[in-house]
């Protein structure tokens, strides 16, 4: 969860402080990578839904995880934001991360996935690999 009265930058700095492994430069670069301005002085509560979504993704990315689990990462994003998320997912995979995406947008999932597992009513209904 993010603190409403803090900027996106300050929220990420707070999270980074808990890990003590993430530099100010990493935070700055991650905010830029998700399309947020690191110098934006607006507080989190004034962010649009799309900006909040981007900040959540930035929080996950800044840790440079080996496993990244994204639940509906395209929610509240415009076309440009969806393309940016797809590019970031591909980049993470190229860097060796395993990325798991849960999403109702089948076209998006297929565009970023090596393997697509379709689940309906709690059961696997198909597995498609590239």
Predicted regions and their residues:
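Q-loop/switch helix immediately C-terminal to the Walker
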Residues: 6-18
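Conserved ABC ATPase "signature" region
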Residues: 13, 24-39
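Hydrophobic anchor residue at the start of the ABC signature
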Residues: 57
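Conserved catalytic motifs of ABC-family nucleotide-binding domains
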Residues: 64
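Catalytic Walker B motif of ABC-type/P-loop ATPase nucleotide-binding domains
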Residues: 68-72
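Helix N-cap at the start of a conserved alpha-helix in ABC-type nucleotide-binding domains
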Residues: 79-80
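H-loop/switch region of ABC-family ATPase nucleotide-binding domains
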Residues: 103-104
């Amino acid at each position: 969860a993010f603190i409403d009265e803090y900027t996106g930058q300050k929220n990420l700095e707070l999270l980074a402080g808990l890990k003590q492994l993430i530099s100010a430069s990493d935070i700055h670069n991650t905010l830029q990578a998700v399309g947020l301005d690191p110098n934006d002085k607006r507080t989190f509560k004034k962010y649009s839904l799309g900006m909040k979504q981007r900040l959540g993704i930035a929080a996950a990315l800044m840790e440079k995880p080996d496993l990244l689990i994204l639940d509906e990462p395209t929610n509240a994003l415009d076309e440009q934001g969806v393309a940016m998320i797809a590019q970031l997912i591909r980049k993470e995979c190229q860097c060796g991360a395993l990325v798991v995406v849960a999403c109702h947008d089948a076209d998006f999932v297929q565009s970023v996935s090596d393997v697509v597992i379709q689940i309906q009513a709690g059961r696997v209904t198909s597995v498609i690999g590239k």
